[in-house]
């Protein structure tokens, strides 16, 4: 008896948005770039690790640039013209990711710094006794 092959169909349609929000999370070890709509629903994302960088190369500004370039290419499917940029974290790839978003032709209205600053939050670890 011959097996029937089923055709995979996707009913998912690409949402058309005019304005979006670009979130850049630049940590010490990785940079994650996410594009959301104004309500915060994720449309596409990329990271330095997802672009193929491993180990200490993942934390470089070049890896962040490649992640932002990948997200900007994906954002063309949504016909996004303008965006706000929200930057979080102390990592190296912040400026290079922002620059890459500008190069992609997306009009940027606001660049906002969202890095959390502790008001003497967590207690530091106990001193080593040798």
UniProtKB/Swiss-Prot annotation:
<keyword id="KW-0694">RNA-binding</keyword>
<keyword id="KW-0689">Ribosomal protein</keyword>
<dbReference type="InterPro" id="IPR019981">
    <property type="entry name" value="Ribosomal_uS11_bac-type"/>
</dbReference>
<dbReference type="GO" id="GO:0009507">
    <property type="term" value="C:chloroplast"/>
</dbReference>
<dbReference type="GO" id="GO:1990904">
    <property type="term" value="C:ribonucleoprotein complex"/>
</dbReference>
<keyword id="KW-0699">rRNA-binding</keyword>
<dbReference type="GO" id="GO:0006412">
    <property type="term" value="P:translation"/>
</dbReference>
<comment type="subunit">
    <text>Part of the 30S ribosomal subunit.</text>
</comment>
<keyword id="KW-0934">Plastid</keyword>
<dbReference type="InterPro" id="IPR036967">
    <property type="entry name" value="Ribosomal_uS11_sf"/>
</dbReference>
<dbReference type="Pfam" id="PF00411">
    <property type="entry name" value="Ribosomal_S11"/>
</dbReference>
<protein>
    <recommendedName>
        <fullName>Small ribosomal subunit protein uS11c</fullName>
    </recommendedName>
</protein>
<dbReference type="GO" id="GO:0019843">
    <property type="term" value="F:rRNA binding"/>
</dbReference>
<keyword id="KW-0687">Ribonucleoprotein</keyword>
<dbReference type="GO" id="GO:0003735">
    <property type="term" value="F:structural constituent of ribosome"/>
</dbReference>
<dbReference type="GO" id="GO:0005840">
    <property type="term" value="C:ribosome"/>
</dbReference>
<keyword id="KW-0150">Chloroplast</keyword>
<dbReference type="InterPro" id="IPR001971">
    <property type="entry name" value="Ribosomal_uS11"/>
</dbReference>
<comment type="similarity">
    <text>Belongs to the universal ribosomal protein uS11 family.</text>
</comment>
């Amino acid at each position: 008896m011959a097996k029937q092959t089923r055709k995979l169909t996707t009913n998912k349609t690409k949402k058309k948005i005019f304005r979006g929000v670009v979130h850049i999370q630049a940590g010490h070890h990785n940079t994650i770039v996410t594009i959301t709509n104004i309500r915060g629903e994720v449309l596409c994302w990329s990271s330095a690790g997802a672009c193929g960088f491993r180990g200490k190369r993942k934390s470089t500004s070049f890896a962040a640039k490649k992640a932002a370039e990948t997200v900007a290419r994906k954002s063309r499917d949504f016909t996004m013209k303008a965006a706000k940029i929200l930057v979080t974290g102390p990592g190296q790839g912040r400026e290079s990711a922002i620059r890459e978003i500008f190069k992609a032709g997306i009009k940027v209205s606001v660049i906002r710094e969202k890095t959390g600053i502790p008001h003497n939050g967590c207690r530091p670890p106990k001193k080593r006794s040798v």
